[in-house]
Amino acid sequence: MRKKSRAMDSGWALEVMHKAPYITVSFIDEDGKPYGLPLSLASVDDVNWYFHGALEGKKLEAIKAHPEVCLSAVTRCTPTVGPKDGSFTLQYKSAIAFGKAEIVTEDAEKIHGLRLICERFLPQHMDAFDQSIARSLSRTAVVRITLTEPPTGKRKQYDKEGVEMKYGRME
């Protein structure tokens, strides 16, 4: 990271990942080309992250060819005029993580991953979860991404006095 003053610790980065409405997962496809997709991921242990999709398609082919992935999450991106010097900038909170993707084959783990996703994004509809699983488990792919190193975080944020908060300073 070029600007060390904006670096945040891995715990902070995990918070960003948990709060992000989606995380862009970057794959390398079977032809060696980059392929990034915004996906809805969920995790309970901060190491294993799950997403779901169709049983076939480009991302599954990419995982089979190159299971290494990069995750990028952003929770705040606010265009700002710098309070001190009038410069145009962005305030942001972001996280980057690296991991290995694997297509889940065991039904119990598929259900676990889907439950995490549903609990995160549609907790008010958990009463319909079992019916949905019965209807669609056999036609749903679930992928587990296991982080291979702690995520890194970065932010640009100003405090109430217009001073940039650097070196992990919190308000």
PLM segments and residue spans:
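Short, basic/aromatic recognition patches
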Residues: M1-T24
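Short, intrinsically disordered, mixed-charge
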Residues: H18, K64-V69, L116-P123
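Beta-strand-connecting loop/turn residues
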Residues: D46-V47, P67, T148
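Anion-coordinating catalytic cores for phosphoryl-, nucleotidyl-, and glycosidic chemistry
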Residues: S5, K58-E61
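Histidine- and/or cysteine-centered catalytic micro-motif in compact active-site loops
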Residues: I28-E30, A54-E56, V74-R76, K100, ...
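Short beta-strand segments
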Residues: A20-L55, L71
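Helix-adjacent hinge/juxtasegments
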Residues: L60-L90
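Charged, gly/pro-rich active-site loop segments
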Residues: R2-K4, T78-E171
